């Protein structure tokens, strides 16, 4: 299983000069793990297990992820995976291609465009599905029935996770807002189904440092007009 990359030193040829320097190359860090975290049921994993797996995937990433979404469904398609929300701030040069695609625990690619909605390619993690066709064009992927269902499922799971965090810990959600708003606002502009869910937890900051949802702002405007 691919877990990040590592540097390897190439051996020098026999006729190399005495002062020749060995060349180093970056290679995939492959680990033989027959039971990776994403293949386990969510009930089998603790919070520390998710953090440990993130460190395995991204050994050069020192910041902890904000939270994760565990994907686990076997009908009408088969999909497992773990997605992580990294701290994004307002960085417009965010590196994509951080989500790795596997089929039956065999690494395929880290380009998931056409499979994962564009706005979610800002996340990190792993998805594994035998139902995603390989070696086909992006337009073919986007037209494939199973891929459409997988894409919609991932979008819904991310929206549900964000909604749950907002409802359970409003203050904590507000504290994370500047680190996650890039994904949420991008998703609201590009995906109608995500917008329908996200408009209930998307936040608008005020100059006083308070945060309001769109519905709350409407109520405040009504109240001020009544006064």
List each model region and its residues.
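Conserved GHKL (Bergerat-fold) ATPase module
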Residues: 1-227
């Amino acid at each position: 299983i691919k877990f990040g990359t590592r540097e390897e030193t190439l051996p020098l040829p026999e006729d190399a000069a005495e002062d020749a320097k060995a060349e180093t190359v970056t290679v995939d860090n492959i680990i033989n793990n027959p039971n990776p975290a994403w293949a386990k049921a969510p009930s089998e994993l603790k919070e520390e297990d998710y953090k440990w797996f993130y460190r395995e995937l991204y050994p050069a990433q020192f910041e902890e992820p904000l939270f994760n979404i565990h994907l686990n469904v076997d009908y009408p398609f088969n999909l497992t995976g773990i997605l992580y929300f990294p701290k994004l701030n307002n960085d417009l040069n965010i590196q994509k291609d951080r989500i790795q695609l596997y089929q039956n625990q065999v690494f395929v690619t880290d380009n998931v465009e056409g499979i994962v909605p564009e706005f979610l390619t800002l996340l990190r993690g792993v998805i594994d599905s035998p139902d995603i066709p390989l070696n086909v064009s992006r337009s073919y992927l986007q037209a494939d029935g199973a891929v459409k269902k997988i894409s919609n499922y991932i979008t819904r799971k991310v929206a549900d996770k964000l909604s749950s965090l907002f409802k359970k810990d409003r203050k904590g959600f507000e504290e994370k807002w500047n680190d996650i708003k890039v994904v949420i606002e991008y998703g609201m502009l590009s995906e109608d189904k995500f917008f329908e869910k996200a408009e209930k937890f998307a936040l608008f900051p005020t100059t006083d440092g308070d945060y309001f949802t769109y519905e709350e702002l409407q109520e405040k405007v009504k109240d001020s007009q009544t006064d």
